[in-house]
């Protein structure tokens, strides 16, 4: 069978394996690459290649992550797998690996375990939109009723955290048997790949989303007006369009009268580009770093939100001591720090370095935010934590 060459035209989807320690996440990752390479072409990756995950830094936090790639006939997948539970927590909170969908691995021999629940909750908090279940080690369970029971438990757990438990694809398989080349179990890996293709919708590309540019710098150019610079995070801004300036102060409207990149004039700025945007009638002192330029009505400023945060351990250069309620650090959003106060969950007195925790934050100035926005927690310019907006309150 001839191997197809990698087509850049295929939609690109980001996924990852999540689930309890030793339920077979890494074995499944190896099995997917192996079976799909054999079936559709591409590179197989061995278990020990994946298990030996390199360390990366995201927002000053060290995370071990393995990245593999595989293809189905219709899509190209980038897949992340983490060796340790702490790596998952950090990865999901920092958004180091944005997932369009996740494969939840549950050993049929054990059923749902504490980290199964924690990973589903994290998925909900950080905005993983779709979860597919792979019931692993099914070759070791002879009793059909037991499999039914485990499947039911997993579906109920998903529903508890507002995932559609009843409609979630659940594939029963054995990653190890598939990896060993047993055709009956290889077929289950193909079934999983087909579920990825059909159940996870094609992600909306950044360029198709509403325009947003976090402002990094502001200049005034005599005779031409005020220019803001930054990297377009999403969408497109065209010359002549109205834009809003959102965050820190009251929202104002203005018009984009020019876009330039590397001193050349353009008619638009697109997602991923570093541009200068010329604004009509806006004075230099009415706009500042930390605000965003956005398509009118697409994003609102907020001060209060629920978040999921990871507090760096001492070894990661974080705090050496716990903090308590009333803690007032800076919250770094996109390009600027804003001071905020925290409220800890009922019954939690203190937070230790290395913990992950849900907390309610109230900022002293509003920031343009949506659910899923990432931030760093800093003290005097040094990062002590990372977080994600789980729910906007006010």
From Swiss-Prot:
Purpose: GTP hydrolase that promotes the GTP-dependent binding of aminoacyl-tRNA to the A-site of ribosomes during protein biosynthesis.
Renumbered residue ranges of the record's region G1: 19-26
Substrates-to-products reaction catalysed: GTP + H2O = GDP + phosphate + H(+)
Binding site for GTP: 19-26, 81-85, 136-139
Domain tr-type G: 10-204
Region entry G5, spans: 174-176
Name of the featured protein: Elongation factor Tu 2
Gene: tuf2
EC number(s) per entry: 3.6.5.3
Region (G4) residue spans: 136-139
InterPro entries from the UniProt entry: EF-Tu_GTP-bd, EF-Tu_GTPase, EFTu-like_2, EFTU_2, G_TR_CS, P-loop_NTPase, Small_GTP-bd, T_Tr_GTP-bd_dom
Keyword Protein biosynthesis: yes
Region described as G2: 60-64
Protein source organism: Photorhabdus laumondii subsp. laumondii (strain DSM 15139 / CIP 105565 / TT01) (Photorhabdus luminescens subsp. laumondii)
Compartment(s) of residence: Cytoplasm
Family, similarity comment: Belongs to the TRAFAC class translation factor GTPase superfamily. Classic translation factor GTPase family. EF-Tu/EF-1A subfamily.
A single GO molecular function term of this UniProt record: GTP binding
Subunit text: Monomer.
Coiled-coil intervals: none
Gene Ontology cellular component list: cytosol
UniProt keyword annotations, A-Z: Cytoplasm, Elongation factor, GTP-binding, Hydrolase, Magnesium, Metal-binding, Nucleotide-binding, Protein biosynthesis
The keyword Zinc appears for this protein: no
NCBIfam families given in the database record: EF-Tu, PRK00049.1, PRK12735.1, PRK12736.1, small_GTP
Region (G3): 81-84
């Amino acid at each position: 069978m001839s191997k197809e060459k990698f087509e850049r035209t295929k939609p690109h989807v980001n996924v990852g394996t999540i689930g309890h320690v030793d339920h077979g996440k890494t074995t499944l990752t190896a099995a997917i690459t192996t079976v799909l390479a054999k079936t559709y072409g591409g590179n197989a990756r061995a278990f020990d290649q994946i298990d030996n995950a390199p360390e990366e830094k995201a927002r000053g936090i060290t995370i071990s992550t393995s990245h593999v790639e595989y293809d189905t006939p219709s899509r190209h997948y980038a897949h992340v797998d983490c060796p340790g539970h702490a790596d998952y927590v950090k990865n999901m909170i920092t958004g180091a690996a944005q997932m369009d969908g996740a494969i939840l691995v549950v050993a049929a021999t054990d059923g749902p375990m504490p980290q199964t629940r924690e990973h589903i909750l994290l998925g909900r908090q950080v905005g993983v939109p779709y979860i597919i279940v792979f019931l692993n080690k099914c070759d070791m369970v002879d009793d059909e009723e037991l499999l039914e029971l485990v499947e039911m438990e997993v579906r109920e757990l998903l529903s508890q955290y507002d995932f559609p438990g009843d409609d979630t694809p659940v594939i029963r398989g054995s990653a190890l048997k598939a990896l060993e080349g047993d055709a009956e179990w290889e077929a289950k890996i193909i079934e999983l790949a087909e579920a990825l293709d059909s159940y996870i919708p094609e992600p909306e590309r950044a360029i198709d989303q509403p325009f947003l540019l976090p402002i990094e710098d502001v200049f005034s150019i005599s005779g031409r007006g005020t220019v803001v610079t930054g990297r377009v995070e999403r969408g497109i801004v065209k010359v002549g369009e109205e834009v809003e300036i959102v965050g820190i102060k009251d929202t104002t409207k203005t018009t984009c009268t020019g876009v330039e990149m590397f001193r050349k004039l353009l008619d638009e700025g697109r997602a991923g580009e570093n541009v200068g945007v010329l604004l009509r009638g806006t004075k230099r002192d009415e706009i500042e770093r930390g605000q965003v330029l956005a398509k009118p009505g697409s994003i609102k400023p907020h001060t209060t939100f629920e978040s999921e945060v990871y507090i760096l351990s001492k070894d990661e250069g974080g705090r050496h001591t716990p903090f308590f309620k009333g803690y007032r650090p800076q919250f770094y959003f996109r390009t600027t720090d804003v001071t905020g106060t925290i409220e800890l969950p009922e019954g939690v007195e203190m937070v230790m370095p290395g913990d992950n925790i849900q907390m309610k934050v109230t900022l002293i100035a509003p920031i343009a935010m949506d659910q899923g926005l990432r931030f760093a927690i800093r003290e005097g310019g040094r990062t002590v934590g990372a977080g994600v907006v789980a729910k906007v309150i006010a």
